């Protein structure tokens, strides 16, 4: 087990309070300011609880949130500011309450209040919660818009949406005219969409002011962030600190570096489990679904053989692609005599609040994207968290009472962590970003006002990729979109998948390609519990295609549709029914976009070669060939890669494949593979492969 930190941790860490050495612009405490908050206007009255016990409970919960007593102060300040940065820890109530306070204060009279979220699940669940609190049907006063789903109406005044969806709206209206206020929530996550949105919203606010239009209020919210950077970027915006209910947290570090963080986490969990009262729950941070499912199984197996007197253990995994009904279990109390052990990805860092957590076990690892513009490879890699992420994880232990965090790394190791997480825009493929900016008619993408500028190499690599996909042309020393590029931008997809759909009519397989792209656009439709691996493999045999994962997924979807989306069938075949229904919705919307473009929609009628040819013509930059020693290397850069164990091709050795993504753990794995002929690739991009071949020879 880790040893205790040398300094009293409670003194070192109080999320929500002002970090040492930083200038405080304003301090809003949850212990005061319940009246008018010093503002000249009267604070608008809150709705009174209704007779319904559920409504009454909601209203009581709302009034008990840390933010409630600062309501008057907050509203008085926000009314008079064009820009504000608000810091308040997870669970303070800022995300659900600030939009309501602004609405109750009349901010929405001249336009909608938008609240952006990095995650689809958060946008939907928050909109549902706020509509309940406002006693209105979801989609009326309060609604949400996420990719492929719009639950709003003409009456909507508070709108939760993913940052990517607000970006898509900016393509058709760069001034965001329908909004009076944009709240950029979870800003610290710095996703690729969030960073682009910062620049788009800032530009819209400036242009509206220059044109004498309705002012746009911008509020940036987070549990933690580099406030100086955000304040400077948004025109020296005042920073409002909102204190919450954080309790003291003891922090323990390991004495020695851990070679196997998974084993260290397992040992820590069972040591806590055998010593702590059953009512105190444990939250463990791991990096991804496979690790989480494997550890969940191991914990359950070990828990069955513990001595008498030990509490029972309820092990609950938590990750984005887990079926929604199973995600909800982490918020429910454990049965009497049971301890909840939640094993989660970084989704539990800030996006959600889980009650009952006394102990946090932090492995200090996370799975994040990395991009190499020279090789053109974008991989998911397991790496160290930043100090900011480590503090966020620690803070999960102090929500309701004092807590304990076990950091499975030494204090010296922690001191070497990066202070902040590198923004995604500086470590990702930027092809989607450049396509969107050009669709918004940004005059020069190289000089766009990014908060953290990507390297010129990354931008140039993205431009080169879009060029290869036929999306760009150079006119009067300016980059513009070709007709194909404009069509690609109309799809809410990565450029390569948009191009796949556009090419499908040439290969007479649009129906099949629409299904495959839709399947790749949602979280995994397959559920693979490690404890039932043999059973999973047995029932899936009937769907497997030797032509690859894409065709296998296509077979599963077709059967799902043929049996009418039967839930029992989904359960028997380990298919996530909710995600499969979402695939059907996504497909319908993509098909509608095709029809608007007057694209002929044809089926290959069982001819899978035409489907694979189409994939080869759009994914030619993601190809690998079998080497003489039986290994694989990417066709263009000769990077060694391997077929992922989850692929239906894992035990096969096709000569040439295209893949959808790369995952780096102990080696670089290809995921979602399709068998292709090398000839098709040279047919798709002869100049590209000639150039690569010449470089390789030199």
UniProtKB/Swiss-Prot annotation:
Picking any one GO biological process from the record gives: positive regulation of NF-kappaB transcription factor activity
Task: Give the Helicase ATP-binding domain ranges.
Answer: 75-243
Please give the superkingdom of this protein's source.
Eukaryota
Where is it localised? Nucleus, Nucleolus; Nucleus, Nucleoplasm; Cytoplasm; Nucleus
Q: What is the effect of changing residue 94 to N/R?
A: Loss of stimulation of rRNA synthesis. Loss of protein synthesis promotion. No effect on interaction with DDX3X, EIF3G, EIF3H and RPL27
Broadest EC class assigned to this enzyme: hydrolase
The motif DEAH box: which residues? 185-188
Tell me the segments the record calls region HA2: 462-553
Keywords carried by this UniProt record? ATP-binding, Cytoplasm, Helicase, Hydrolase, Inflammasome, Nucleotide-binding, Nucleus, RNA-binding, Ubl conjugation
Q: Does the keyword Heme apply?
A: no
Give the region (Disordered) as residue ranges.
1-20, 29-50
Decide whether keyword DNA-binding is in the record: no
The record's subunit annotation is: Interacts with UBTF. Interacts with DDX3X, EIF3G and EIF3H; the interaction is independent of RNA. Interacts (via HA2 region and Helicase C-terminal domain) with the components of the large ribosomal subunit RPL3, RPL7, RPL26 and RPL27. Binds to mRNA. Interacts (via the helicase C-terminal domain) with MAVS. Binds to double-stranded RNA (via the helicase C-terminal domain).
Q: Per the similarity annotation, which family is this? A: Belongs to the DEAD box helicase family. DEAH subfamily.
User: Can you say what this protein is called?
Assistant: ATP-dependent RNA helicase DHX33
Organism of provenance? Mus musculus (Mouse)
């Amino acid at each position: 087990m880790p040893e205790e930190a040398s300094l009293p941790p409670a003194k070192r860490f109080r999320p929500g309070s002002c970090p040492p050495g930083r200038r405080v612009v304003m301090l809003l405490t949850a212990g005061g300011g319940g009246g008018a908050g010093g503002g000249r206007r009267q604070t608008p009255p809150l709705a009174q609880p209704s007779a319904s016990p559920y409504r009454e409970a909601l209203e009581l919960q709302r009034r008990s949130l840390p933010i409630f007593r600062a309501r008057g102060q907050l509203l008085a300040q926000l009314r008079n500011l064009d820009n504000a940065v608000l810091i308040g820890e997870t669970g303070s109530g800022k995300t659900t309450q600030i939009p309501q306070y602004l609405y109750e204060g009349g901010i929405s009279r001249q336009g909608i209040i938008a609240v952006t979220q990095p995650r689809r699940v958060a946008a939907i669940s928050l909109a549902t919660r706020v509509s309940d609190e406002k006693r209105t049907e979801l989609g009326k006063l309060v609604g949400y818009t996420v990719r492929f789903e719009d639950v709003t109406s003409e009456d909507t005044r508070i709108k939760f949406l993913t940052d990517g969806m607000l970006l898509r709206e900016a393509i058709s209206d760069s001034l965001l005219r329908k909004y009076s206020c944009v709240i950029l929530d979870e800003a610290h996550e710095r996703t690729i969409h969030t960073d682009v949105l910062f620049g788009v919203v800032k530009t819209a606010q400036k242009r509206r002011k220059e044109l004498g239009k309705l002012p746009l209020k911008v509020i940036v919210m987070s549990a933690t962030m580099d406030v100086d950077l955000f304040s400077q970027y948004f025109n020296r915006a005042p920073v409002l600190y909102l204190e919450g209910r954080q309790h003291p947290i003891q922090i323990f570090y390991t004495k020695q570096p851990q070679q196997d963080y998974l084993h260290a986490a397992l040992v820590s969990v069972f040591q806590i489990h055998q010593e702590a009262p059953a009512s105190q729950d444990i939250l463990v941070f791991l990096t991804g679904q496979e690790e989480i499912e494997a550890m969940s199984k191991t914990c359950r197996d070990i828990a069955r053989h513990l001595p008498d007197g030990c509490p029972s253990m309820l092990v609950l995994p938590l990750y984005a692609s887990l079926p929604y009904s199973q995600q909800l279990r982490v918020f429910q109390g454990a049965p009497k005599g049971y301890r909840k052990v939640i094993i989660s990805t970084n989704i539990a860092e800030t996006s959600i609040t889980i009650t009952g957590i006394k102990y946090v076990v932090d492995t200090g690892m996370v799975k994040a994207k990395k991009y190499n513009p020279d090789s053109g490879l974008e991989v998911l890699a397991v790496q160290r968290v930043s100090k900011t992420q480590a503090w966020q994880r620690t803070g999960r232990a102090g929500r309701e009472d004092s807590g304990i965090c076990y950091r499975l790394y030494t204090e010296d190791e922690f001191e070497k962590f990066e202070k902040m997480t590198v923004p995604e825009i500086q470590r990702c493929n930027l092809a989607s970003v450049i396509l969107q900016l050009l669709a918004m008619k940004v005059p020069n993408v190289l000089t766009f006002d990014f908060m953290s500028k990507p390297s010129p190499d990354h931008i140039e690599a993205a431009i080169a990729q879009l060029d290869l996909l036929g999306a760009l042309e150079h006119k009067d020393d300016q980059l513009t979109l070709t007709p194909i590029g404009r069509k690609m931008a109309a799809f809410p997809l990565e450029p390569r998948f948009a191009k796949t759909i556009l090419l499908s009519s040439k290969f007479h397989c649009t129906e099949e390609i629409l299904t495959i792209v839709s399947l790749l656009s949602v979280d995994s439709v397959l559920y693979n519990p490690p404890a039932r691996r043999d059973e999973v493999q047995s029932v899936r045999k009937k769907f497997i295609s030797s032509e690859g994962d894409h065709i296998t997924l296509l077979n599963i979807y077709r059967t799902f549709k043929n049996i009418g989306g039967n839930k029992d069938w989904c359960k028997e075949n380990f298919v996530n029914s909710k995600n499969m229904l979402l695939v059907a919705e996504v497909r319908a919307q993509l098909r509608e976009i095709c029809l608007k473009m007057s694209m002929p929609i044809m089926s290959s009628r069982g001819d899978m070669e035409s489907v694979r040819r189409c994939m080869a013509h759009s994914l030619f930059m993601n190809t690998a060939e079998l080497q003489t020693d039986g290994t694989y290397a990417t066709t263009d850069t000769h990077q060694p890669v391997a077929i992922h164990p989850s692929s239906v091709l894992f035990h096969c050795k096709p000569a040439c494949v295209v893949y959808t993504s790369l995952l780096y753990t102990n080696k670089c794995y290809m995921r979602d593979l399709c068998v292709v002929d090398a000839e098709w690739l040279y047919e798709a991009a002869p100049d590209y492969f000639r150039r690569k071949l010449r470089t390789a020879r030199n």
